Amino acid sequence: MSDRKPVRGRHQARKRAVALLFEAEVRGISAAEVVDTRAALAEAKPDIARLHPYTAAVARGVSEHAAHIDDLITAHLRGWTLDRLPAVDRAILRVSVWELLHAADVPEPVVVDEAVQLAKELSTDDSPGFVNGVLGQVMLVTPQLRAAAQAVRGGA
């Protein structure tokens, strides 16, 4: 068994999810395929750490809901198109919008703060403010989207 452990903490898990989404886009495959490849590699080579479960959940979730997530981001871009954004910003926004819609255990302000921090660490000087603005607009509609999804699932 390997002495290497998966990355601890959600910040690092989110950062890794952003990297996986970036890799998937560059390779022209889904993030879920990247997760599957990484899981198989970690299984075959014990010295390679497994992905953090949250990283895998986010990447798979973004893959599963990609069209809806991209539509929601696009609807809140002003003066930009999704394909014109830096690839890292796209990945950060996709992870964050997935969390806003599907990670009920993560408070919305935490999602936005984490996204801004990732933009500071990984992207351009203008990206943190841009990411904050887009997510601020998306947050205005997420309660209605979550309620509609719950109603479709037949929940209360």
Swiss-Prot record:
GO molecular function: RNA binding
CDD domains named among the record's database cross-references: Terminator_NusB (cd00619)
Pfam name, any one: NusB
Record's keyword annotation contains RNA-binding: yes
Domain of life per record: Bacteria
Keyword DNA damage set for record: no
Entry keywords, A to Z: RNA-binding, Transcription, Transcription antitermination, Transcription regulation
SUPFAM superfamilies documented for this protein: NusB-like
GO cellular component annotations of the record: cytosol
GO biological process: DNA-templated transcription termination; transcription antitermination
Note: Was identified as a high-confidence drug target.
Family to which the UniProt record says this protein belongs: Belongs to the NusB family.
Known function: Involved in transcription antitermination. Required for transcription of ribosomal RNA (rRNA) genes. Binds specifically to the boxA antiterminator sequence of the ribosomal RNA (rrn) operons.
Subunit organization: Homodimer.
Protein name: Transcription antitermination protein NusB
Source species of the chain: Mycobacterium tuberculosis (strain ATCC 25618 / H37Rv)
